[in-house]
Amino acid sequence: MKTLILTGGGSAGHVVPNIALIPALREKFNLVYIGSDGIERDLMKGRGVPYHTVHCTKLVRGSVLKNIAMPFRFLKSVSEAKKALAAAGADIVFSKGGYVALPVVLAAKKLRTPVLTHESDLTPGLANKIIARRCRAVLTSFPDTAKLFANGIYTGAPIRTELLRGD
């Protein structure tokens, strides 16, 4: 069975869609989650998916001083992500964006691991704008968002099957 890496985080909006995909993906892939030590770690607990932590930092917009060490931390996070991908035996990466996804996607590209990303918002986030060119496809929740990317494909939003049943 191939190994699919799930990544994305910084907010629940980047993690919950990945959680919705787990039951279907688990049937065809070994799943591993790579994220930060933040909300995604808490949300993934008890889901039966191995978790690897990457110590990444969020860009603080408008503050040069708070970002001065960021390039060094970022390089370290790419290195950590590369090690986690190699240890997991990654065959493909599925990203939901957010600052956590950036080092994971860049590490995947260094390892020549294919990447898909999903943009849930009508207006693409910064991380997905940066990684879009490095992805096989940018999957989107909205048709108009797909048009913003050369490799955009409208797929709709991943949701839990319980919502379809009204549970």
Regions from the PLM with identified roles:
Residues 3-9, 29-73, 153:
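Conserved nucleotide-sugar phosphate-binding/catalytic loop shared by glycosyltransferases and other
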Residues 2, 89-91, 136:
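Conserved acidic residues
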